[in-house]
Amino acid sequence: MAYSKILFCFMIGFVGFLPAITMATQYLVGDDRGWTLDFDYQTWAKNKTFKVGDTLAPPPSEGLTSGYDVITLTKPGKKWYICGVPTHCSDYNQKLVITVEDGAPAPAPASPAPQTEYWVGDDKGWTIDVDYQAWAKGKTFKVGDTLVFKYTKGHHNVFKVNQTGFQNCIAPPPSEGLTSGHDVITLAAPGKKWYICGFPTHCSEHKQKLAITVEGAPAQTPPVWAPAPAPGTPKKIDTGNSYKITSPYKMFVGGAVSIWTILTLV
């Protein structure tokens, strides 16, 4: 009975370790062939994805001569390894080059800034004898917003003009006008914008014209992501995978709880 209690407490302590463990990959260089002569290590590395935190075992590196050397890939980028025994690299191709990817997750794209669609004149639309400056007052136009000019086709049109054309009601050539009856203009740049109707007297006598100031686009919401965990010390196992401990403090607490519980029950 006491043995069953001890085993149960051990399992509780082991479960306490699990939140502190994350999965990494341990690559046995050359698989069953290992690190040796006359082996195509580039073919072996092809299609493998090496990430920060993974390990190579046993790869060659300066000062590693144990026969089971483990290197943790701590930084992204190109990595090169060779055997330093004479002729092993030059004559027998005992060398390896890999590309290590960043283990941090890619940040989510920034949320696009909200855009506003303005129907010029609201329910009155684009027509004569409407005070469009009063309509525009109090509105904040930003880059990316749109203006919708709604009117009866053939009765009005829309021209974008400069300040002089706006003040004197001078319309550009007819080919530059918008005439669909439902003209949508995207505000692509900040600054002053002027629009008029090109029909005779509509601008000069009936005030069918609009001037607005467009502000720069609002700042986008920056992406938020958690930083990648710092690579820990891998534990070598035979399956080709390894566990890396991300929090020694959690391990200590889990072990202390297990020991305390066992001593209480014995």
Swiss-Prot record:
One of its GO terms (cellular component) is plasma membrane. Residues 1-24 form the signal peptide. The chain crosses the membrane at residues 245-265. Induction: Accumulates in roots, in a RAM1-dependent manner, during colonization by arbuscular mycorrhizal (AM) fungi (e.g. Rhizophagus irregularis); the expression level correlates tightly with AM development. GO terms for molecular function: electron transfer activity; metal ion binding. It is found in: Membrane. InterPro entries: Cupredoxin (IPR008972), Phytocyanin-like (IPR039391), Phytocyanin_dom (IPR003245). Disulfide bonds join C169-C203. This is Blue copper protein. It comes from Petunia hybrida.
